[in-house]
Amino acid sequence: MLYLLNLLKDITGSYGLAIILLTVLVKLILWPLIHKGNKSMRRMQRLQPKLKELKEKYKDNQQEFSRQMMDLYRREKVSPFGGCFPMLLQLPVFIALYSTLDSSVELRHVSFLWAQDLSRPDLIGPTFMGIGLHPLILISTGLMVLQQKLSPPMADPSQQKIMMLMPVIMLVFFYSFPSGLALYWCVNNILSILQMKYSQYAAKKEELALNNTKPA
């Protein structure tokens, strides 16, 4: 990972810009899977009426409802976890970047924007009881909330609750992480929102074209 960051730094002239470029490259590589996952989420949204019918029909039998729901997914060729797969594929990059920021002396005391050290949290202002203000993590959390607002609702209530808790979990878990890692996650969330908006635009355009080709 350090070799790749050094290569990107030679291109951009900055480790901060190198991390941003790395995020863009990862997103471009994963774009086919992300686009497929977004399509799966839209298909899930179209299944909502059928899922509501099943939920009402089997409201007293949760086990049978779960079985019928999975059968519906299978018939419609929809994966309830399709949107999560690209995020899981990014974990190795995330872990490798964290390890590099934590252990590489080249990245210590390297500043970018307001962050004085990419290998340390981007602390701004005084601390209170040992807790300071880390803008990049707060921005990333806000972007995650926005992304959830723009995403189609999940059919499974338990999955929906987990996704609603994810920004809070990420905020607590990553609050003291290196600012270089927070920068990666922040840019990643921005690109995810842009990709989602593009997928929604492409889907509407495709649906409009399909409607125009239907015989009157």
Protein language model regions, located:
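Helix-loop-helix
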Residues: 1-216
